[in-house]
Amino acid sequence: MNAIIYHTKGCMKCKLTAHLLNIDTKMVLIDPIDKPNDPIIQYMRRNNMKSAPLVRIYDDDKLMDEWNDFKADKINKYKENKDGRTN
């Protein structure tokens, strides 16, 4: 299982999400001025996602879940335990 976390510069909720999730995670900075990020920013706007991070959870390249903002319940569902298993 792995995650992609789309974050904004200096976002503490984004850093905390990555830290607590504790699975293989790719962090991707999103900046409204940076054109390569435009598809993600437009996706978030279309789906009324107004707060970073945008978190996508994958299992074998299949999207399993997605959310935005800091969501402790979602993090707890997918975080890796010390023995390497997810909850």
Please name every model-derived segment.
Residues 57-86:
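Non-catalytic, surface beta->alpha helical segment in thiol-disulfide oxidoreductase systems
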Residues 12-13, 35, 73:
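Short alpha-helical
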Residues 32-50, 80-82:
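Thioredoxin-like thiol-disulfide oxidoreductase module
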Residues 28-30:
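Gly/Gly-Pro-rich "capping" loops immediately C-terminal to redox-active cysteine motifs
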Residues 23, 42, 46, 73, ...:
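Charged/polar, solvent-exposed surface patches and flexible loops
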Residues 1-26:
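Local sequence-structure signature of Cys/Sec-based thiol-disulfide redox active-site neighborhoods
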